[in-house]
């Protein structure tokens, strides 16, 4: 299900030179021939170190029902990934922009391309962040079907034991030592 925000939201396309090359409506950018565009991923932790995993809503057009990192999104034109992270935390998880602390960039150069079972492609330059949330979350059911807080070591074990249950971008992100170490810290 699309929301009014997703109908008007723009994603920033990336040209062959690796620089911004225009925009495209988010509602129609993801197809079988998705252009390369900017995004971000974020892993949220609580002060006790537990990591939030979310299961994508079943109505999502790509990877419905798949478990993944805490949240993802697309910076809009002129928006920094950090500002987009705070915006999406509110839209997706009901976290006030001030409710996130210590947002830090873990994988600045992460990118991936993946095709879901319906043939829709994700092709993103997608820096990966971690941030701390101290308060409660109130996930938007149009975005998140289920969620679970887990110790970082349990997250890594679950992905290793059942990789098919998790999003391809999360699996690829966890191939990076810097992220694995951050989740275990």
Question: For each predicted feature, which ranges?
Answer:
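Nudix hydrolase/Nudix homology domain
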Residues: 65, 77, 109-185
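Short, charged/polar surface micro-motifs in flexible loops or helix N-caps
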Residues: 45-51, 58-61, 111, 135-136
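Conserved Nudix-box catalytic region and its N-terminal flanking loop in Nudix hydrolases
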Residues: 2-3, 29-39, 50-95
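Acidic, metal-coordinating catalytic segment for phosphate/diphosphate chemistry
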Residues: 2-41, 45-47
């Amino acid at each position: 299900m699309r929301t009014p925000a997703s109908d008007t939201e723009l994603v920033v396309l990336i040209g062959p030179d690796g620089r911004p090359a225009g925009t495209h409506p988010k509602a129609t950018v993801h197809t079988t021939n998705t252009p390369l565009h900017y995004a971000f991923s974020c892993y949220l932790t609580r002060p006790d170190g537990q990591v939030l995993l979310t299961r994508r809503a079943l109505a999502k057009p790509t990877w419905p029902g798949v478990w993944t990192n805490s949240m993802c999104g697309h910076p809009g034109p002129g928006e920094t990934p950090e500002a987009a992270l705070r915006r999406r935390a509110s839209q997706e998880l009901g976290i006030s922009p001030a409710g996130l602390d210590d947002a830090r960039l873990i994988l600045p150069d992460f990118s991936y391309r993946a095709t879901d079972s319906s043939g829709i492609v994700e092709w993103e330059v997608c820096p990966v962040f971690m941030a701390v949330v101290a308060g409660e979350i109130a996930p938007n059911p149009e975005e998140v079907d289920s969620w679970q807080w887990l110790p970082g070591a349990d997250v890594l074990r679950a992905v290793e034991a059942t990789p098919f249950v998790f999003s391809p971008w999360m699996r690829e992100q966890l191939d990076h030592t810097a992220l694995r170490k951050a989740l275990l810290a």
